Structures are given as C-alpha cells and as structure tokens.
A protein has these predicted regions:
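Residues that define the transmembrane beta-barrel architecture of outer-membrane proteins
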Residues: 39-43, 94-98, 107, 149-153
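Gram-negative outer-membrane beta-barrel transporters
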Residues: 1-72, 156-160
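Generic recognition of flexible, low-complexity loop/linker segments
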Residues: 46-47, 99, 144
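C-terminal beta-signal and adjacent terminal beta-strands/loops
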Residues: 52, 64-78, 103-161
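Extracellular loop and loop/strand-boundary signature of outer-membrane beta-barrel proteins
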Residues: 27-34, 84-89, 140-145
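Flexible, solvent-exposed coil segments and beta strand-coil junctions
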Residues: 21-29, 76-83, 133-138
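A broad helix-preferring feature
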Residues: 56, 99-103
Length: 161
C-alpha cells in the first residue's frame, strides 16, 4: 500500500460467490437444495504490516462464510395424499471471525503473539420450516444448537541457531 502512503503495509482480499444445486427427479421425496457444506459466499481479507528493518510483522485477518447446510433434511409421504412430513435442512449460520498476530525479532530471537477469533461470536445452527397458519404463509425458525467457542491466545518464543 505504498501508493497511498502506507509503507510496509499490504492488503489481500479473497471472495467467492457460489451457487450450487443438488437436483432430484421429479415426484420423489427429495427437494432440490444447495450442496451440503457449501456456503453461498466466502470473504477473507487481511491487512499486513512487515518491517524487516525493525523486525516487526503483524496481521489482522477477517473471515466470513454464508449460511450453509450441515444436515440434509428429508420429506416423507406424498403431498398429493395430504400426509407429507417435512424435516427441514439444518444450517450453520453466518459468523464473523477476526484473528490478530504480531511478532518482533531481536537478532536470532523472535517473540510472536496471536489472538484467534477475537470477536468470539456464537455458532448458531438453525432449521427453517415454511408453514401456513390461518391461511397465512410464514417461516418458523428454530435454533437447534448454539455454542460459544471463545477466543484463543498464543505466545511463542523462537530462537534460531
């Protein structure tokens, strides 16, 4: 990023917009859906600082994934018979993650500190079912599982012989 006066800094961006589809034969119990485990988008960015003259190195990384199927649902029965039962797909919901790292060299000695998952946002897993209540269509959203993994810290000291 020297061109904007940020000497020793660099920036990276990687993003993907993905459309996947698993198709089934008509008349079967399965409903067309996105591929299991495939996020519809991914975002990875990073801001890096590297000053070899002073021995400093640092990074801030941001990652996000889109809502993705982690468990494929199923449909039983036939809607023409009026007794169809739908078990919805289970989704991992989008979440933001920021990682930090910094290191400093003192000759042959290097000290490095990292913080992973600085935001420590909860993981949410949900199911969505479309229903009709009193003639009105609506979606029921249920959290089937959630947990907060927390952030992790690391301090490393290395010496080169």
């Amino acid at each position: 990023l020297n061109f904007i006066g940020m000497r020793n800094f660099s920036f990276s961006f990687n993003g993907a917009w993905i459309k996947s589809k698993v198709q089934f034969k008509e008349g079967g119990n399965n409903i067309d859906r996105p591929m299991q485990g495939q996020s519809p988008y991914l975002i990875n960015t990073g801001l890096f600082y590297n000053n070899p003259d002073k021995g400093w190195n640092a990074a801030v990384l941001y990652n996000r994934i889109g809502k993705r199927i982690i468990g494929v649902g199923n449909r039983y029965g036939s809607s023409s018979e009026g007794d169809a039962r739908n078990i919805p797909n289970s989704y991992e919901m989008p979440r933001n993650s920021i990682d930090l790292s910094a290191s400093k060299k003192f000759g042959k000695l290097e000290i490095k500190a990292t913080v992973r998952d600085l935001l420590a946002e909860r993981y949410y897993f949900k199911q969505f079912e479309d229903v009709t209540v009193n003639g009105q269509a609506r979606t029921i959203e249920e959290v089937t599982r959630s947990y907060k993994p927390g952030r992790s810290y690391n301090l490393a000291i290395a010496y080169s012989f």
